[in-house]
Amino acid sequence: MMPQLQFKDAFWCRDFTAHTGYEVLLQRLLDGRKMCKDMEELLRQRAQAEERYGKELVQIARKAGGQTEINSLRASFDSLKQQMENVGSSHIQLALTLREELRSLEEFRERQKEQRKKYEAVMDRVQKSKLSLYKKAMESKKTYEQKCRDADDAEQAFERISANGHQKQVEKSQNKARQCKDSATEAERVYRQSIAQLEKVRAEWEQEHRTTCEAFQLQEFDRLTILRNALWVHSNQLSMQCVKDDELYEEVRLTLEGCSIDADIDSFIQAKSTGTEPPAPVPYQNYYDREVTPLTSSPGIQPSCGMIKRFSGLLHGSPKTTSLAASAASTETLTPTPERNEGVYTAIAVQEIQGNPASPAQEYRALYDYTAQNPDELDLSAGDILEVILEGEDGWWTVERNGQRGFVPGSYLEKL
């Protein structure tokens, strides 16, 4: 026998900012709530029909004559009228029983709604907290990397000036290099702190997600059990009330006997599973741990730790013009000048990152606000509709809105 599948193992999403699995489960519970209402409406209308039918039978029996008949036929006719009245009364009683079942289902549905709302509130809180801290961590990372680049540039400038510059220029350059280094150190501290906070919230969200999945599976189990039993009881009530229709209701019972709650849950999970693993933690990336590949085999030139540069303007999909990328693509190596042999310079390879063209253009919606940082970027407001022209692998997408083109972060968009 296969082990019972669990919601908590099958509704994850690798995208750190997406909550697809939770949304699928929540929709399942909402669909189940609608099913409860449909069952309630069925019982309500059947109770009304049984009540009308019972009252009409009682009225027919009481108005029937037969007083002119005598002896055994009179007794038989009187018995028929009495039994017809009894049948009518039993149908009226059945209507009352169906209304009791209806009230029980309504109370069950409301209890499940209250329980679901509690878990929804908790999940909304942790999801918003996770997304907020993720955005903060990414901004801290961006600032940290920029400060590191500034510190490297200032250090290189100081080394050049110290070789043949004036004393004041050397001191000024040295002070600037020291300030840039301090700024980079502070940015690194903020970045580490942001990652630590994000990991704490991520762990809390993951635990809440598991707990919510377990609660939702229990609710689904209870709902299926209650509805299955309600169908069973309703079928038995109608079967006992109308023996002549027993064959039809027997078919219902045979069908209900083949109903398996476990099989229903397994089938749903297999059809709608969104993944078996939660998103991986966001790692801390040290700026100076990146691999630098020298493009020259000259033994006189060694790689300099911390001399890494990022030429974002030469990459397709980054917020720079493609003409700059084309003109810079031919420059593959940077070599030190002969008169600077006493300095240490590292040749840096530049790879051209190809973008994924979105052909034909597709419409996307902005999820968050974004303020352009460069002239070739576009401002975004949550809810804006845009056409994606090019999807850059570095995360910057070329979009068009109202005749204007520019770059925006791809993670801020969702496909319509």
UniProtKB/Swiss-Prot annotation:
Stored Gene3D superfamilies: Arfaptin homology (AH) domain/BAR domain (1.20.1270.60), SH3 Domains (2.30.30.40)
Q: Set out the biological process GO terms recorded for this chain's protein.
A: cell adhesion; endocytosis; inflammatory response; innate immune response; signal transduction
Changes after translation:
Dephosphorylated on Tyr-345 by PTPN18, this event negatively regulates the association of PSTPIP1 with SH2 domain-containing proteins as tyrosine kinase. Phosphorylation of Tyr-345 is probably required for subsequent phosphorylation at other tyrosine residues. Phosphorylation is induced by activation of the EGFR and PDGFR in a ABL1 dependent manner. The phosphorylation regulates the interaction with WAS and with MEFV.
Domain F-BAR positions: 5-264
Q: Where in the cell is it found?
A: Cytoplasm; Cell membrane; Cell projection, Uropodium; Cytoplasm, Cytoskeleton
Q: So which residues are the signal peptide here?
A: none
Which residues get modified to Phosphoserine? S318
**How does this protein sit in the membrane?**
Peripheral membrane protein
The entry lists its GO molecular-function terms as: identical protein binding
Q: What does this protein do?
A: Involved in regulation of the actin cytoskeleton. May regulate WAS actin-bundling activity. Bridges the interaction between ABL1 and PTPN18 leading to ABL1 dephosphorylation. May play a role as a scaffold protein between PTPN12 and WAS and allow PTPN12 to dephosphorylate WAS. Has the potential to physically couple CD2 and CD2AP to WAS. Acts downstream of CD2 and CD2AP to recruit WAS to the T-cell:APC contact site so as to promote the actin polymerization required for synapse induction during T-cell activation. Down-regulates CD2-stimulated adhesion through the coupling of PTPN12 to CD2.
Q: What is this protein called?
A: Proline-serine-threonine phosphatase-interacting protein 1
- What species was this sequence derived from? Homo sapiens
Gene giving rise to this polypeptide: PSTPIP1
